[in-house]
Every structure is written in C-alpha cells, then in structure tokens.
Amino acid sequence: MRLPALLLAVLALAAAAPAAAADAARGQELYESRCGGCHSLDANRVGPAHRGVYGRKAGTAPNFSYSTAVKNATVVWQEKTLDAWLINPQALIPGQRMNFRVALPEDRADIIAYLRQQSGK
C-alpha cells in the first residue's frame, strides 16, 4: 500500500517541477545559424540589430527602416511576445516583412534566453 502512495507522490512532484531552464549558450548557436543570415547583435542587416531587443518596443531600433506595420505596433519584446513572433511573425504583427519561423519550443526558448542575456536582462 505504501508503494502506490509513494509513486503518486513522486509523480505529483515531477508534474509540478518547472520546465528545464532555457540554455543561452545553445541559443547563441541557434541564433548564429538560423537568425544570423539576416540579423546580428550590433549591426542592421536585412533585419534590425538585436542587442538590447529584450524589453524594447518593436520598431524602435536605431537606423533601421521598419515596415509601417512594425513601426505602428504596440508590441514590447519580452518572453511571450518574442515567442509569439518566432512562432508566426505575421500573426503577431500583420503586414510585417519577416518570413521565418522557429518550430520547436525549446529552440525558441533558447534563442530568447540568448537575446535576453545580450540585452543585459
């Protein structure tokens, strides 16, 4: 009788445990391989520079020519908004120009952890 109760307790604790922490080092690798063709941390390319993006309002990076949709967006780049953006940019800000998605939740979490780290947050 004690074994089933112990098993239930262990399962309950496992279910309540937080998800694994995002890995910023892996996020850097993913960022460089998947995002680096259009973005960098410090220079605008096809897309805007990303250093300091976490916590910044969309469409406000200096010296980048944003679409009207992004300039007029009220989005602030944080965990949830960056995740939504990487899932489907067009759904978050219709009319924007980015046509790239990151399918796996763990990949998105790691990229976001890297961007947050590079923003000093």
Where are these regions (language model features)?
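Sequence/structural segment immediately N-terminal to covalent heme-attachment motifs in c-type
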Residues: 22-45, 50
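Short glycine/threonine-rich turn/loop motifs
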Residues: 24, 48-68
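N-terminal signal peptide c-region/cleavage motif recognized by signal peptidases
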Residues: 14-17, 22
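A generic structural signal for secondary-structure junctions
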Residues: 43, 54-58, 87, 116
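Short Fe-S-cluster ligation motifs
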Residues: 63-83
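Solvent-exposed, acidic/flexible segments
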Residues: 24, 28, 43, 75, ...
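C-terminal capping alpha-helices of c-type cytochrome domains
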Residues: 78-121
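Bacterial N-terminal signal peptides
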Residues: 4-15
